[in-house]
Amino acid sequence: MDKAKKQELIATYSRKEGDTGSPEVQIALLSERINHLTSHLKEHKKDHHSRRGLFMMIGKRRSLLNYLESVDIERYRDIIKKLGLRK
C-alpha cells in the first residue's frame, strides 16, 4: 500500500482531523493489507511466511472489531457495512 492510498483511507475513516489510532482507521488499514496479501497468496501458494502474517493480521482485525462491538455497536455496524466484511 502506497502513502497516498494510506492517507486516503485515514481521511475516509478517521473520526477527526489527524486521527490515525481509532479502531475504524486501524480496521480499514488492516483490511486493505489483508486484501492485498490475499491476492498475493492466490498466486504464490507456497509462501507460508506471508500466510502466517496474513493470519496474524486477520486476528488483529478480529480483536479490534470485537472491541468496537463491545464499546459502540453502531460504529461497529457502520464499519462492517462500509468495508463489506459480512455477507
From Swiss-Prot:
- InterPro entries (UniProt xref): Ribosomal_uS15 (IPR000589), Ribosomal_uS15_bac-type (IPR005290), uS15_NS1_RNA-bd_sf (IPR009068)
SMART domains referenced in this protein's UniProt entry, alphabetically:
Ribosomal_S15 (SM01387)
Matching Pfam families = Ribosomal_S15
Could you tell me the superkingdom of the organism this chain comes from?
Answer: Bacteria
- Keyword Phosphoprotein set for record: no
Q: Which UniProt keywords apply?
A: Ribonucleoprotein, Ribosomal protein, RNA-binding, rRNA-binding
Q: Which GO terms describe its cellular component?
A: cytosolic small ribosomal subunit
Q: Which GO terms describe its biological process?
A: translation
Which CDD domains does this one have? Ribosomal_S15p_S13e
Q: Please give one Gene Ontology molecular function term for this protein.
A: rRNA binding
Q: Does the keyword Ribonucleoprotein apply?
A: yes
Q: How does it assemble?
A: Part of the 30S ribosomal subunit. Forms a bridge to the 50S subunit in the 70S ribosome, contacting the 23S rRNA.
Task: Give the record's family classification.
Answer: Belongs to the universal ribosomal protein uS15 family.
PANTHER family documented for this protein: RIBOSOMAL PROTEIN S15, BACTERIAL AND ORGANELLAR, SMALL RIBOSOMAL SUBUNIT PROTEIN US15M
Cited HAMAP family: Ribosomal_uS15_B
Primary role: One of the primary rRNA binding proteins, it binds directly to 16S rRNA where it helps nucleate assembly of the platform of the 30S subunit by binding and bridging several RNA helices of the 16S rRNA.
Instruction: Read off the NCBIfam families from this record.
Output: S15_bact (TIGR00952)
Name of the protein this chain belongs to? Small ribosomal subunit protein uS15
